[in-house]
UniProtKB/Swiss-Prot annotation:
This is Ras association domain-containing protein 10. Plays an important role in regulating embryonic neurogenesis. One of its GO terms (biological process) is positive regulation of neural precursor cell proliferation. It comes from Mus musculus (Mouse). Residues 487-498 have a biased composition (Polar residues). It comes from the Eukaryota. Residues 1-133 form the Ras-associating domain.
Amino acid sequence: MDPSEKKISVWICQEEKLVSGLSRRTTCSDVVRVLLEDGCRRRCRQRRGQRRGLTEDPSGQLELPEPPDENDEDDDDAMPPGMLCGPPQCYCIVEKWRGFERILPNKTRILRLWTAWGDEQENVRFVLVRSEASLPNAGPRSAEARVVLSRERPCLARGAPARPSLALTQEKQRRVVRKAFRKLAKLNRRRQQQPSSPCSSTSSSTASSCSSSARTHESASVERMETLVHLVLSQDHTIRQQVQRLRELDREIDRYEAKVHLDRMRRHGVNYVQDTYLVGAGIDLDGQTPEGEPEDATLEEKGTEPAAPLDSEAQAAALEELARRCDDLVRLQEERAQQEELLERLSAEIQEELNQRWMQRRNEELAAREESLEPDGGPDGELLLEQERVRTQLSTSLYIGLRLSTDLEAVKADLDYSQQQRDIKERELQGLLQSLHTFEQTVVHDGALGSSGPSREPQPQTCAEMWVDQARGLAKSCPGNDEDSDTGLSSMHSQDSDSVPPVCESLV
């Protein structure tokens, strides 16, 4: 169904028809008329084939071919060729898309509609059905079984509309459709091959009226059966589209779940599920108090136990706020990168424009100088030559100055960025030093508490003190302190070392 080839496909029952030669003025009524004419030609060809297949017995009577067996459930070619019978006004084209359908008006430009679908053309089907087998309104609707009311027995419409097709399996539905096709073919065959006996002179008007009424009743039955068959096939198309749509939605859900899982793995780690379930267990384990602790610590922990849920809620709120700020930060970084890229592109364009202007001006000056030197070659020409040379040097110096100014601006920007990074590193270093100072005080406090305990405990405290002394010595002997003396880091190191008493003195 390529729109460049001016052709579309229309489904008739379970057969796909390709309608070619469309133009921008082709309407749905034109397509219906062409399909009905094709059906009439097929019926005529089959009728001629049936006439050629008639055999004459010795008694001189014509013998019709044997009708198909009604109990043959596996006959797939039971669709009658005379399925489309009636005027074009009795048929319409239904547009089906992802389980939704609507009736197309007769004046709809079908090629324009098909082109407007764009990428969704593979999910669109045009189905030719009888007008009685579709809804009266032309709006979109979901697939739902519709009961065709009988005009002869209106009492069946009093009860609730039954939907037995939903309870049947796919094989049973296929058998029902085949049986309906065979029955409709049988009715059409009887109507087409009914022997036309010559009217005798003694035939009355009563006999002719009875035959006409029987023929009318038979045609009404055929139309009703055809309507039911079209309805079943239309619902079959709709159900297939709905099943395909459900599979697409399942695939989209799987892709989204995999994306969310990978996102969480990158954000919270591979074992984020276990960590989430073990958060409560970790809080419970931290809330347990050992037996050898003093009673004051136990009472203090008991007093903080009821506030644990509040802490967890506050932690969750803080995590949400942190996630929101991280998203804002990422968005700002993306905008900053875009602005920087735009700035670089504009700078390159400006520089290129300046170069072109300078070269153009230089060429014009050279051309003017050549023209001025041609008339006279005396002292005036030498003065003009010297003037042009000085002017050329001035323009060159101006160009070089512009380039140096541009480079200077770039260097200033890099210097500002480096200054910002240095400030950030300095703040981080101050935070680490503060943490180290706090840790030293904690170690000193633990050593003071451990001095009153058994004599076997000072050995681990001495190891901790040695580690702290080594850390302090590394902090003081850092070679970067001399370079950063203007920032006050060396004075801060000296203040820290002076303010904190040695660990050995505290132990003594």
